[in-house]
Swiss-Prot record:
Domain of life: Bacteria
Protein name (Swiss-Prot/TrEMBL): Uncharacterized PPE family protein PPE61
Pfam families registered for this protein in UniProt: PPE (PF00823), PPE-SVP (PF12484)
Family from the record: Belongs to the mycobacterial PPE family.
Cited InterPro entries: PPE_C, PPE_dom, PPE_sf
Coiled-coil segments on the chain, per record: none
Biological process (GO), any one: response to host immune response
Length: 406
């Protein structure tokens, strides 16, 4: 409601403008509303970012979709309220600006009082009309002050009226269901009672997963698949997946058994290979005895245990009871080739030592047979090469003639 500021003298309008609290409170209110708007907008953006991160990557499922649908209205309310708070701050800023403009246009009260004092003084001394022109000029100035104050007040009133036009604030709607806790308890009880038949809900779960996967590319199809999944889950399907998994468990157990048998077979193969390698011990013992005969007093005591142990190992001492026995190493050998026992091994050529030279007096001797039976090409340990290295001539020492000899 506008007042008729033109009917009020400038003393009243100027006094009102200069006696008020000023625009300081308006500027403080505008800053406060602007801060409220920024906080609401930040909260809305944070909500939106967190929900997008949860429902898009980390949290998938019907609960995620329902949570997003429930919290979306609240995020929209935050955004709308932030815009309204920003509008309020803008309007208050406009009102403060209008006040400062009106204050600048208003005539200061001391100037009005000085004008009135001069007029009264001139009227008091105007005996012969000599002050009439001066009084008229002061009255004209006073009328201009009146008009100026009235204009300032009208402009300020219009600005304040526009600033008071605001959109009403609304409260956020309730985004929770009061019947949620009882429904959750009932659902938990039903799931516990039907835990044995949970395998029949695979089709409903599949439909719900399809609906969730379609959310980024076709959100309009998501509600259809979610509702279809809930309907299918409500149907009491028989438990058919359990039998299939029992069959798979049996196949896996059979595969594990076959693997164990293969491991046992590999172990037996390793033992047989070790037995074959141990069969060479008697030949090594015989070759060692032939290459370097030990003294007669210790030869039987030393070689008998070694030969007996090698013989027992090579004849199958490692075989367990109840196994199939087989004879090994019955064939003869010529070089690296196995031959029938009737074949005769070629005679081993004897390598003689170097013949004695006229420069030596030690006679030569026959060298022992080279090689180990069963391992051709392997030199026997201690195969001697008897004889002394021949000497060809004697190095002579020549002495020079001493100086004292003359």
């Amino acid at each position: 409601m506008f007042m008729d500021f033109a009917m009020l003298p400038p003393e009243v309008n100027s006094t009102r403008m200069y006696s008020g609290p000023g625009a300081g409170s308006l500027w403080a209110a505008a800053a406060a509303w602007d801060q409220v708007s920024a906080e609401l907008q930040s909260a809305a953006e944070t909500y939106r970012s967190v929900i997008a991160s949860l429902t898009g990557w980390q949290w998938l499922g019907p609960s995620s979709v329902r949570m997003g649908a429930a919290v979306t209205p609240y995020v929209e309310w935050l955004t709308t309220t932030a815009a309204q708070a920003r509008q309020t701050a803008t309007q208050i800023t406009a009102a403060a600006t209008g006040f400062e403009q009106a204050f600048a246009m208003t005539v200061p009260p001391p100037a009005i009082m000085a004008n009135r004092a001069q007029v009264l003084s001139l009227i008091a001394t105007n005996f012969f009309g000599q002050n009439t022109a001066a009084i008229a000029a002061l009255e004209t100035q006073y009328a201009e002050m009146w008009e100026q104050d009235a204009t300032a007040m009208y402009d300020y009133a219009a600005t304040s009226a526009a600033a008071r036009t605001l959109t009403p604030f609304t409260s956020p709607q309730q985004d929770t269901n009061s019947a949620g806790l009882p429904a959750q308890s009932a659902e938990v009880s039903r799931a516990t009672a039907n835990a044995g038949a949970a395998d029949g809900n695979w089709l409903g779960n599949l439909l719900e997963e399809i609906g969730i996967l379609l959310l980024p590319i076709a959100p309009e199809l998501t509600p259809f698949f979610l509702e279809a999944g809930e309907i299918v889950n409500a149907i009491p399907f028989p438990s058919i997946v359990g039998d299939e998994f029992c069959l798979l468990d049996g196949l896996l157990a059979w595969y594990a058994t076959i693997g164990s048998i293969n491991n046992i077979n590999s172990m037996g193969t390793g033992i047989i290979g070790a037995e074959k390698n141990l069969g060479i011990l008697p030949e090594l013992g015989s070759a060692a005895a032939a290459a370097a005969p030990p003294p007669a007093d210790i030869a039987p005591a030393f070689l008998a245990p070694l030969t007996s142990m090698a013989k027992s190992l090579s004849d199958g001492a490692l075989r367990g009871p109840g196994e199939v026995s087989a004879a090994m190493r019955g064939a003869g050998t010529i070089g690296q080739m196995s031959v029938p026992p009737a074949w005769k091994a070629p005679a081993v050529t004897t390598v003689r030592a170097f013949d004695a030279t006229p420069m030596t007096t030690l006679p030569g001797g026959d060298a022992p047979a080279a090689g180990v039976p069963g391992l051709p090409g392997m030199p026997a340990s201690g195969a001697g090469r008897a004889g002394v290295v021949p000497r060809y001539g004697v190095r002579l020492t020549v002495m020079t003639r001493p100086l004292s000899g003359g």
